[in-house]
Amino acid sequence: MSLSSHQAILLVDGYNIIGDWSDLKQSRDRHGLEAARYELVECLINFSAAMAYRTKVVFDAHYQDTPRSTETYTAALSVHYTAFAETADTYIEKFCATFARKKYQQESTRLIVATSDRAQQLTVVGYGAEWLSAPMLEREVGIAVQKTNSKTKKQTKSKPPGRFLFNTLDPAAQKRLKQMRQGL
């Protein structure tokens, strides 16, 4: 998908969100950071698709002496690991500064940053980005899940019974097909 097909770019401070959402905290405490990261990414893949967001989840190098890396999960979501000694905050601030300079806004794209870090909030808003706290993002994700589930239920109810192609035809076509089968 091209940038213009997305309504917004969502930058997520991964560890900040994990530290705030109770389900992710429990997963982190029971199974480790990797499990919590996986759950967050899975959750945001669906959310990004439902909202037509291009999402970048940013994780600190977390004491790992590794170079910066990116893992692309879908066309709408990628995970960015910062370089050693680079924080997610720094990565997000640099992205916001570049975003403001390059004027992605001309393409009517919004930039949203999800973090509960107050200093980060003030910085990104200063660059013209929108801000979502971790609890606000959790609510937005919950609303998107409910909407998706209700759409799925409506589609399931509207499906014709049976597994035959005949059942998918409109009544006039079914009548004509019956006549053809009977040789009329």
Question: What is the role of each PLM region?
Answer:
Residues 2-5, 9, 16-184:
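Nuclease catalytic cores that cleave nucleic-acid phosphodiester bonds
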